């Protein structure tokens, strides 16, 4: 739209066009709308409802009480708005993507069907199923009545449990506000904790308000000494597990009553039903067309990097790229929401707003009225979402939850981690928005990729081969204030980012992976990425136990004692110029749980030995000496482990899925099957960690310690067995006498490292081809000789040469020619490019050149002091040549200034630093002295190190730091020796395994043999 067609009604009121509601709005309007190029904002207050300009027309953003805002009206004009609902109960087929727990009180009786009213007097749980109708893809909300929240208690003899529960409720201020219906009944259950528990009487305590569960359970435990079970299971999980439902999939409802008035949601259709009306269609794994949104924001930073609580730091633009999961990747609808006028952008719908407030209302309503289910972006959990929500709440007093998919009781928040210190594991910012599946592709990329950095540009280049056009945040104010053309350029950049993120979503197909994990773990999709793996295993264990009438106790303090974790076979550091075979235990920890039948329900703890009566040691149970004494676990024929049973069924299902995958030709179905098997793999690997997290949902550190103990024992047994094998033993493993050529009779196997679930075996005297020949047979022979199913060793990879530095740190060349690095940074990421490239040349030479490899092997097998007395092997001299050439390049000024630059972020104002004795701050102060443009907060300040004035030795880094542009412009010589020392330190860290695994020794050798010319 051209600038002349847009007018700002809040700067030039045209009151005749506006309907005045009772509400008054605050608007912050950029001054550049009145005076091009001006900074700052104008504060305007008035009753005008939010407005938008689109295609030369002025429209009202906000909708009426039915949620019919600008996006809904647009759909109505296109003929894609809300379909008609039946006026009577009829069957309904629909797909569910989210399940919510809400509470109705008796006040709702007037608006719900009469046969449902008994469920909500005085209050009751109503489960909301959000999804799409099968018939036409319309968004639906199904309100399900009849689900209960409950827990179990084992009470002392003589306690009147019902009276105790009522007493607890009377003591609660919550219950006085909302009366709660109570039911207490005796049931027969068994505790899962410990072998030999017999079925007994427990009290099942049902409460009509879920918030009462925790209070009542704590009261019974603390006041009356009751043992509490499953008080940490919410009504949503009860709904899924009690009825064998799914969290993502197709449902059928035999009698769905449409709700035409007094609706709870903004879905296109809303229905009421009871739990008993529902059934699941598991055989159908297809998806309806769900709506995915990728968004990005551009902000104005008046004083540097934008701060949400600074009124003038407006959100200038929001790009929204929409994609339907039923469409091909790339078929996107591109939308730009912008403040002020903006020239047209090809392929983009541009909506112009007079103020930020109007644009925020439009953004929230876009998510609601376009029925968005999946929201993604890049680092949106840490920046975009907090920024939008902070602006909405703190600047404009908007409640974003009220604009969501649920009319009341919705959540729209960002939960930031409060502590990143000791014991804080995998702390992530969590986005919780009712009715949305939030997926931050930044977190996904960090989890699935191994890159030097995870900027969107880097990831897009690596995965998509796409180049991201970047605009520095310091350019944003200038572009925005420049007028419609500047905003067009800014908008193109903004939309491009969102489109790239949507491409990444489709590349990883992460939405399908999330859905498959949700199904197998019995949890809603929105909890998959943010809530970790504990909740997944807990839900599965709960489901398995429930089928056998077992119940899970609440964890106690005694369950949280520490234990010794996994250990490794210490590495024999050095350079190995012979093949190194790596054998892995396939799914080590899950296979140990299966092989030894480990579980809460098969364990007999110290002091409970009477439970072993009638059982035979070794035949009926195994014993393990742990930190707290001797623990026993009964074998499968006595009682099958729930954990092992889960693993067995999952792995069998995964095997069946992989078989289907191999025969499947439909691309979409192949994607679903692949994500299903991956979801099973992830969940299997989480079982051990579930038992070993002291502050987890159901910890049992005795099980975790038993697993790690067995893992250590298995590594040690395998090491001894492998090292005892002779070439003749290996020859005998050939599938037939003539299948293999004779192996080298002088060959020898030696385990040089063992890491949790793998062994590194040096195959000294064997060729690469010989090692590859016997690798699989060796692994299979070791498995047959030492272990029971399903424990299995597999030949994973073979290195042709290997630099083994310390545990979990090595670099080597695989037999296919690829270089593999584990735990190794060639140099620190903060090192300059000069040091990085030269260190890479050194490493490549050591791993690729035959003479250098021989020399490196010799060096690693002798004391480093011999290098001073006997000199370096001739084959190692090319490494020294690289370092000497680097020094010459520095001295003669052949290294570009850009390769010598370092950079550090200016994280706060200069006055806020406790010490300014840092190189980047020294350069900042030089900018001040020279009256040059100053960097803003969050800018990275570049610097190089130059020779100190007068050639003073031992000068501090702050005295040597200089602006690269200034140094190049004025011919200031760089600090040659400083950079060369950095290079030697980087090379020494790489080569330390050649010199007694001592980086200091390696540095002294390199310093001794590099020919640093005299001054």
UniProtKB/Swiss-Prot annotation:
It is found in: Host nucleus. Keywords: DNA replication, DNA-binding, DNA-directed DNA polymerase, Host nucleus, Nucleotidyltransferase, Transferase, Viral DNA replication. Disulfide bonds: none annotated. One of its GO terms (biological process) is viral DNA genome replication. Its main location: host cell. Pfam families: DNA_pol_B, DNA_pol_B_exo1. It catalyses: DNA(n) + a 2'-deoxyribonucleoside 5'-triphosphate = DNA(n+1) + diphosphate. It comes from the Viruses. Forms a complex with the major DNA-binding protein BALF2, the DNA polymerase processivity factor BMRF1, and the alkaline exonuclease BGLF5. Interacts with the putative helicase-primase complex composed of BBLF4, BSLF1 and BBLF2/3 proteins; these interactions may coordinate leading and lagging strand DNA synthesis at the replication fork. Belongs to the DNA polymerase type-B family. Replicates viral genomic DNA in the late phase of lytic infection, producing long concatemeric DNA. The replication complex is composed of six viral proteins: the DNA polymerase, processivity factor, primase, primase-associated factor, helicase, and ssDNA-binding protein. This is DNA polymerase catalytic subunit.
């Amino acid at each position: 739209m051209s600038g002349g067609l847009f007018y700002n009604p809040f700067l030039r009121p045209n009151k005749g066009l506006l309907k005045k509601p009772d509400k008054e709005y605050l608007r912050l309007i950029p001054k550049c709308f009145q005076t091009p190029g001006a900074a700052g904002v104008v504060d305007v207050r008035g009753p005008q409802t939010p407005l938008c300009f689109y295609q030369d027309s002025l429209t009202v953003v906000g909708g009426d009480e039915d949620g019919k805002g600008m996006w809904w009206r647009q759909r109505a004009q296109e003929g894609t708005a809300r379909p008609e609902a039946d006026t009577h109960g009829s069957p309904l087929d629909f797909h569910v993507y989210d399940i919510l727990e809400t509470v109705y009180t008796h006040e709702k009786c007037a608006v719900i069907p009469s046969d449902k009213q008994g469920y909500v007097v005085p209050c009751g749980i109503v489960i909301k199923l959000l999804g799409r109708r099968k018939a036409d893809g319309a968004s639906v909300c199904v309100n399900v009545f009849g689900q209960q929240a409950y827990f179990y208690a084992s009470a002392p003899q003589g306690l009147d449990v019902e009276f105790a529960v009522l007493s607890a409720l009377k003591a609660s201020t919550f219950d006085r506000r909302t009366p709660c219906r109570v039911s207490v009944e005796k049931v027969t259950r068994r505790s899962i904790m410990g072998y030999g528990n017999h079925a007994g009487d427990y009290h099942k305590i049902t409460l009509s308000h879920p918030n009462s569960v925790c209070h009542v359970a704590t009261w019974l435990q603390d006041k009356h000494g009751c043992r509490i079970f499953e008080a940490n299971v919410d009504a949503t999980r009860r709904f899924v597990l009690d009825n064998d439902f799914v969290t993502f999939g197709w449902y059928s409802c035999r009698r769905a009553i449409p709700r035409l008035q007094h609706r709870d949601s903004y879905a296109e259709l809303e229905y009421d039903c009871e739990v008993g009306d529902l059934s699941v269609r598991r055989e159908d794994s297809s998806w309806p067309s769900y709506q995915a949104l990728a968004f990005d924001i551009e902000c104005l930073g008046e004083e540097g990097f934008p701060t949400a609580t600074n009124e003038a730091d407006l959100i200038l633009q929001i790009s929204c790229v929409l994609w339907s999961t039923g469409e091909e990747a790339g078929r996107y609808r591109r939308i730009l929401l912008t403040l002020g006028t903006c020239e047209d952008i090809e392929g983009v719908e541009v909506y112009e707003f007079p103020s930020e407030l109007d644009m925020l209302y439009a953004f929230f309503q876009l998510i609601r009225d376009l029925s968005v289910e999946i929201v993604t972006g890049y680092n949106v959990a840490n920046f975009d979402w907090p920024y939008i929500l902070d602006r909405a709440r703190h600047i404009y007093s908007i409640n974003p939850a009220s604009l969501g998919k649920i009319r009341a009781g919705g959540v729209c928040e960002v939960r930031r981690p409060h502590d990143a210190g000791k014991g804080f594991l995998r702390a992530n910012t969590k986005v919780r928005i009712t009715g949305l599946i939030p997926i931050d592709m930044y977190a996904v990329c960090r989890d699935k990729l191994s890159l030097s950095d995870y900027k969107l540009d880097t990831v897009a280049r690596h995965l998509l081969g796409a180049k991201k056009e970047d605009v520095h945040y310091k350019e944003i104010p200038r572009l925005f204030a420049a007028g419609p053309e500047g905003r067009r350029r800014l908008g193109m950049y903004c939309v491009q980012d969102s489109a790239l993120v949507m491409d990444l979503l489709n590349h990883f197909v992460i939405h399908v992976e999330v859905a498959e994990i949700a199904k197998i773990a019995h949890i809603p999709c929105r909890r998959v990425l943010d809530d970790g793996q504990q909740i997944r295993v807990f839900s599965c264990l709960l489901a398995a136990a429930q089928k056998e009438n077992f119940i899970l106790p609440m964890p106690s303090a005694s369950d949280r004692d520490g234990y010794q974790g996994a250990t490794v076979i210490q590495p024999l550091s050095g350079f190995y110029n012979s093949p190194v075979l790596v054998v892995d235990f396939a799914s080590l920890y899950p296979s140990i749980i299966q092989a030894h039948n480990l579980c809460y329900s098969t364990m007999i703890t110290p002091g409970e030995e009477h439970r072993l009566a009638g059982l035979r040691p070794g035949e009926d149970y195994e014993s393990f000496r742990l930190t707290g004494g001797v623990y026993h676990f009964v074998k499968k024929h006595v009682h099958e482990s729930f954990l092992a049973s889960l693993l067995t069924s999952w792995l069998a299902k995964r095997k069946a899925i992989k078989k289907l995958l191999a025969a499947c030709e439909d691309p979409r179905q192949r994607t679903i099957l692949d994500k299903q098997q991956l979801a099973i793999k992830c969940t299997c690997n989480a079982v051990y960690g579930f038992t070993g997290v002291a502050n987890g949902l159901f910890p049992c550190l005795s099980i975790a310690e038993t697993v790690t103990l067995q893992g250590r024992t298995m590594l040690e047994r395998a090491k001894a067995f492998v090292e005892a094998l002779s070439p003749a033993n290996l020859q005998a493993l050939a599938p037939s006498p003539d299948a293999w050529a004779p192996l080298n009779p002088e060959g020898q196997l030696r385990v040089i490292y063992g890491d949790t679930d793998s062994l590194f075996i040096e195959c000294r005297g064997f060729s690469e081809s010989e090692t590859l020949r016997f690798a699989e047979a060796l692994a299979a022979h070791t498995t047959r000789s030492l272990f029971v199913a399903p424990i299995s060793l597999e030949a994973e990879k073979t290195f042709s040469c290997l630099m083994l530095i310390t545990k979990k740190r090595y670099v080597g060349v695989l037999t296919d020619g690829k270089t593999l690095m584990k735990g190794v940074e060639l140099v620190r990421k903060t090192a300059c490019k000069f040091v990085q490239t030269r260190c890479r040349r050194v490493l490549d030479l050591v791993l690729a050149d035959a003479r250098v490899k021989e020399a490196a092997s010799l060096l690693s097998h002798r004391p480093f002091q011999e290098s001073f007395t006997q000199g370096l092997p001739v084959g190692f001299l090319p490494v020294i040549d690289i370092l000497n050439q680097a020094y010459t390049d520095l001295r003669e000024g052949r290294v570009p200034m850009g390769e010598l630059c370092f950079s550090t972020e200016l994280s706060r104002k200069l006055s806020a630093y406790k010490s300014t004795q840092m190189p980047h701050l020294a350069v900042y102060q030089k900018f001040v002295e020279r009256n040059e443009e100053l960097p803003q907060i969050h800018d990275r300040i570049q610097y190089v190190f130059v020779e100190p004035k007068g050639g003073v030795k031992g000068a501090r880094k702050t005295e040597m730091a200089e602006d690269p542009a200034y140094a190049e412009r004025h011919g200031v010589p760089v600090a040659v020796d400083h950079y060369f020392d950095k290079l030697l330190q980087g090379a020494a860290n790489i080569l330390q395994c050649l010199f007694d695994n001592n980086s200091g020794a390696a540095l002294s050798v390199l310093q001794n043999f590099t020919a640093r010319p005299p001054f």
